Amino acid sequence: HSTYFVQLGGRRLLIDPVFSTYASPVFFANRAFEGTNLYTAEDMPDIDYLLISHDHWDHLDYATATALRSKVGQVVCPLGVGAHFEAWGYGKETVFEGDWYSVLEGKDGFAIHILPARHFSGRSLTRNKTLWAGFALVTPERRIFFSGDSGYGKHFAEIGARFGGFDLAMLDCGQYDENWRYVHMMPEDTAQAAEDLRARALLPGHVGKFAIAYHTWDDPFKRIVAASRGKPYRLLLPLIGEPVALPIASDGEILRWWEAGR
């Protein structure tokens, strides 16, 4: 869905992990597709930074967060989201909360930037009591961008200009509908956002595990392939668990794994 394990600058980062079989407050809603639950919290090594983009159920999972607690060095999240972690037994000193454009700086030029997104937040009956965000992961050699959930907007071009482009952009590209395109990008928006960000490679996300919209499960893959033709970035569509190594070659064949068995 939107879970990424990243090794960068000698650090291990885990982004929006959801290892549960459902992404909702009840077990019978938003259940994972068969065959997509390949990993558990027990499979994860120690994590230097746990990044959470916002507190929707498909990005912040109680069972996953509590199972990871002993392995996490620092939680990084937008304003208000840290309260969930403190309620779930994380020490306050381990949680870094920030507004848009806040920066958590480490040694050797490593930095995590909390950046704007166009979305909303809330769990159960609460709504918009916490902030939502994307992240830029920066070292002297590499720059990676994660959009979180976001509709298309001018913030992508502004972020691209601010950072001078990215080696890899991991962008929202699923669970969309014309009725809510201001909070979730259509695949064509995702392609434009990658170009705005000056990304050398695009890895579309928010797709492949949960059905939270009305489109078919493979529609995002087909549409992003079409929308990316002629774009200046390389499109990456890995299988769940397939590693992607930086730097990424400028071209390469797309394995259309979603067409297997047809």
What does each model-found stretch correspond to?
Residues S2-L8, E105-F166, R181, M185-D189:
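Catalytic core of the metallo-beta-lactamase
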Residues T3-D55, Y62-A67, C77-G80, G122-T126, ...:
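Pre-active-site segment of Zn-dependent metallo-hydrolases
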Residues V6, D16, H54, D61, ...:
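Divalent metal-coordination and catalytic microenvironments
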Residues I15-D16, V75-V76, K92-W100, D167-D172:
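Short hydrophobic/aromatic-enriched beta-strand-loop microsegments
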Residues P17-F19, D55, A117-H119, G148-S150, ...:
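Active-site metal-binding loops of divalent metal-dependent hydrolases
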Residues M44, Y49, Q74-E86, R143, ...:
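Cap/insert and terminal regions of metallo-dependent hydrolase folds
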Residues D61-S70, I212-K222, P247-I248:
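Metal-dependent catalytic neighborhoods of phosphoester/phosphodiester hydrolases
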Residues P78-R142, R223-E242, P247-A249, E253:
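Metallo-beta-lactamase
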